[in-house]
Amino acid sequence: MKYLLDVNMLIQGIWQGHPGHVSAFAWLKGKNLSICPLVELGYIRISTGVLGAPMPETRRLLQVFLTERKVSRIDDDLPALESSPQKSSEVTDHYLACLAQKHGLKLATFDTRISHHAVEVIS
């Protein structure tokens, strides 16, 4: 199985100080992984804004992760109106699940609130 990472999986997989890093790091090992520009941008925004990490370090760690894990990139090539979230809090997650489905992937997430058949909740 090939997986599209959501923003939280990417953050937890990269930042060693994150409480979820150990479980994310263990799950990610040996998996066939993909990301898309939306996820990359979300990682950068949260890492630099919420976590307060410096931009150069944030970008460097992302590049190291992508290279070491041999993560492939997929295009954000699904029109936004082709996903159909029911409320505003579902917009990005539902889009990523639909994007994963379009590319024959599963969306890997720790978020149990995403209701979509292309989602694999990691525990």
Predicted features by range, described:
Residues M1-I35, V50-E57:
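Short, well-structured N-terminal submotif of metal-dependent ribonuclease cores
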Residues L5-D6, C36, S89-E90, D111, ...:
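Histidine- and aromatic-rich ligand-binding microenvironments
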Residues M9-L10, V39, P79, R113-I114:
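Alpha-helix capping/helix-boundary segments
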Residues H21, E40, T58-L62, D93:
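A general structural signal for well-ordered alpha-helical segments in protein cores
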Residues A24-K31, A100, R113-H116:
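Alpha-helix C-terminal capping segments
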Residues C36-I46:
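Short, conserved active-site loops that position catalytic residues or coordinate cofactors/metal ions
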Residues E68-R113:
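Active-site neighborhoods of divalent-metal-dependent phosphate/nucleic-acid chemistry enzymes
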Residues H116-S123:
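Active-site regions of enzymes building and remodeling cell-envelope glycoconjugates
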